[in-house]
UniProtKB/Swiss-Prot annotation:
Residues 255-258 are annotated as: G4. Pfam families: EF-G_D2 (PF22042), GTP_EFTU (PF00009), IF-2 (PF11987), IF2_N (PF04760). It comes from the Bacteria. PROSITE patterns: G_TR_2, IF2. GTP binds at residues 151-158, 201-205, 255-258. This is Translation initiation factor IF-2. One of its GO terms (molecular function) is translation initiation factor activity. Residues 151-158 are annotated as: G1.
């Protein structure tokens, strides 16, 4: 009893006791709202609170690493289930944690009436002024201007650079197209002082839009080359838009003034329509008529470039670790990964530890555009560097770190981000449109052309992929299983053999053993050095997958001049006026403006003999099993149905 008393809870005083709830009243209160009703009420309250709190944005700004389904739903102020439902009807099975690519985000956002802007679009177009830090300002010196040469294909950009460098390098380029960006530095006399200019040569073909955009990212002035005998062309307009997006001054080089039909004034007039008004017409745009072939006015053009960039106050700090941009990169069979680097701040030295995007490197050797080995390269200097662990991506910024440990830490984070981006891209490449499939269900299975793409440099890979995106995809899909710079390897051949793919190489070679493997497995390997031919052949291959179509092929015409009744049937006596008539061909019988018969020609006779055909200028008798109502003056149109290769339609 003592133990029991010690453990018992003491009774509360009466003043502190609570009144016991009435059990029946509580039961009646619970019965008023069921579980389902309570859940529905809470959902409505949450939805109302969300709608009151969040307003759908006027514009959706997407970060560079894209968005998950849940993040997109939050930014659009909608339920994630709405996004998943929208994706399902587009043939994409997604979860709330799945990362969406940019194209998918744009499509979904447009359904909800919200336009999309990628966060890095504006940033990528502008010069990388962030290369200069606050600590650099006490050590700044003048640096050489970086000049981008832009314009329409075949307007003479490479020839102009050739004239500037006094070296004949332009003649050997396939199809007149510069296949990847080159960087060159020249030294000129300006006011009795040696001054330098660094030139970036961006390819002129419209397929290389991405490379031109990278060129303007690092440039201080754009030289717009326009042929005096051709005028403003589509790529000219594109180059103007890139230069304006980069907010860099434009100097126009009106090239080929030596050619017959050259009209610099016509070029100025066409450019004025694009709000580029020449100085001698009262505007502020420097326009210099030049002849790259004859070397006319090249010195004047260089002078103008220096004058235009003097007001820009271009500076950099050479006494710091280097920073800059990867202009181009490729895999060399003997040297390994090779990158063309433009130093924008600091000084790059042999032995420096470099991080370029997710790629780590230690500079083993550097050469300039004349293949001279260098120990260091200062601001605005372009070099070809060896020593990267893998091929960096053209357009990535690079930075030198004091030691390998700190560089590895940065590269590791970037590599994780790059892997996530690749996974998102792979998910996008596997998408199949349910709408497209249902629309083609009656015409057979969806056709695909599998490709493996290898090219000399990353810039070429991007350009070709961009061009493939422009091909019609309504009936045949192009699926790129692998795209990378470098030579064609046995692994590529194995992948092609397993997937039924064609290997397309652009300015690249085959590794040892790859050709033998391709021959043994029957894999088709195509190599090209001109992008036009590559795209043309791929389009022909896509058309080869289409079912041929039946089309009419005209044979001839005849005129009915007499009608002979034989029992229940009739025979028309005809005169062949053009072409020929063939037995068992198709005919249309025209009577005035009407077609009274459209079908087979069953009998064809000449002088009571059955014949296979009757040529122009001869008489014959014709008959059909399904038509006997012939009349004098009827016109017979003869034709046959033939199969024809179909063309892709946009």
């Amino acid at each position: 009893m003592v133990l029991s008393a010690s453990l018992a809870r003491p009774a509360k005083p009466k003043s502190q006791r609570k009144a016991a709830p009435k059990p029946m009243a509580a039961m009646r209160k619970r019965k008023k709202e069921t579980t389902r009703q309570r859940q529905r009420r809470r959902a409505m309250e949450l939805r109302a609170a969300r709608e009151a709190k969040q307003v759908r944005p006027e514009m959706l700004i997407v970060p560079e690493d894209n968005l998950t389904v849940q993040e997109l739903a939050d930014m659009l102020s909608v339920e994630s289930s709405e996004i998943i439902k929208s994706l399902f009807f587009k043939g994409i099975i997604a979860t709330v944690t799945q990362t969406l690519d940019m194209n998918t985000i744009e499509t979904v956002a447009e359904e909800f009436g919200v336009p999309v802007l990628q966060d890095d679009v504006e940033e990528a177009a502008k010069k990388t002024v962030e290369m200069i830090e606050e600590a650099d300002k006490e050590h700044l010196i003048r640096r050489p201007p970086v000049v981008t040469v832009m314009g329409h294909v075949d307007h003479g950009k490479t020839s102009l650079l050739d004239a500037i460098r006094k070296a004949r390098v332009a003649a050997g380029e396939a199809g007149g197209i510069t296949q990847h960006i080159g960087a060159y530095q020249v030294e000129i006399d300006h006011n009795d002082e040696a001054r330098k200019l660094t030139f970036l040569d961006t390819p002129g073909h419209e397929a290389f839009t991405a490379m031109r955009a990278r060129g303007t990212k690092v440039t201080d002035v754009a030289v717009l080359v326009v042929a005096a005998d051709d005028g403003v062309r589509p790529q000219t307009l594109e180059a103007i838009s890139h230069a304006r997006a980069a907010e860099v001054p434009i100097v126009v080089a009106i090239n080929k003034i030596d050619k017959e039909g050259a009209s610099p004034d016509r070029v100025k007039q066409e450019l004025s329509e694009q709000n580029l008004l020449a100085e001698d017409w009262g505007g502020d745009v420097v326009m210099v008529p030049v002849s790259a072939i004859k070397g006319e006015n090249i010195d004047k053009l260089l002078e103008m470039l220096l004058l235009v960039t003097e007001v820009e106050d271009l500076q950099a700090n050479p006494d710091r670790l280097a920073r800059g941009t990867v202009i181009e990169a490729h895999l060399d069979k003997a040297k390994g990964p090779v990158a063309t680097l433009l130093v924008q701040n600091g000084t790059l030295k042999t032995g420096d530890v470099v991080a370029a995007g997710p790629v780590l490197g230690k500079v083993r050797a550097m050469v300039d555009d004349n293949r001279q080995r260098l120990k260091e390269a200062g601001p605005s200097f372009a070099v070809e560097a060896l020593g990267f662990s893998e091929v960096p991506t053209a357009g990535d910024e690079f930075e030198v770190y004091p030691d390998e440990k700190s560089a590895r830490a940065v590269v590791g984070d970037r590599a994780s981000d790059a892997r996530a981006t690749r996974l998102a891209q792979q998910m996008a490449s596997r998408r199949v449109s349910l709408t497209a499939m249902s629309g083609q269900a009656n015409e057979g299975e969806l056709k695909e052309l599998n490709l493996i793409l290898k090219a000399d440099v990353q810039g070429s890979v991007e350009a070709i992929l961009g061009s493939l995106e422009q091909l019609p995809k309504d009936e045949v899909q192009v699926r790129v299983l692998l795209s990378a710079p470098g030579e064609v390897t046995e692994t590529d051949v194995d992948l092609a053999a397993a997937s039924g793919a064609v290997i397309v190489g652009f300015n690249t070679s085959m590794a040892s053993g790859a050709k033998k493997a391709a021959d043994a497995t029957g894999v088709d390997v195509r190599d090209y050095d001109v992008i036009y031919k590559l795209l043309e052949d791929i389009q022909l291959a896509m058309e080869g997958l289409l079912e041929p179509e039946l089309v009419e092929e005209a044979l001839g015409e005849a005129e009915v001049r007499a009608v002979f009744t034989i029992g229940k049937s009739a025979v028309a006596g005809c005169y062949v006026t053009t072409g020929k008539l063939q037995r068992n061909c198709k005919v249309r019988v025209h009577r005035g403006s009407q077609v009274v018969y459209d079908g087979d020609l069953d009998s064809l006779r000449r002088n009571k003999d059955d014949v296979k055909e009757v040529a122009t200028g001869f008489e014959c008798g014709v008959g059909t099993d399904r038509f006997a109502n012939w009349e004098d003056g009827d016109r017979i149109e003869a034709f046959k149905m033939v199969t024809q290769r179909r063309k892709l339609t946009t």
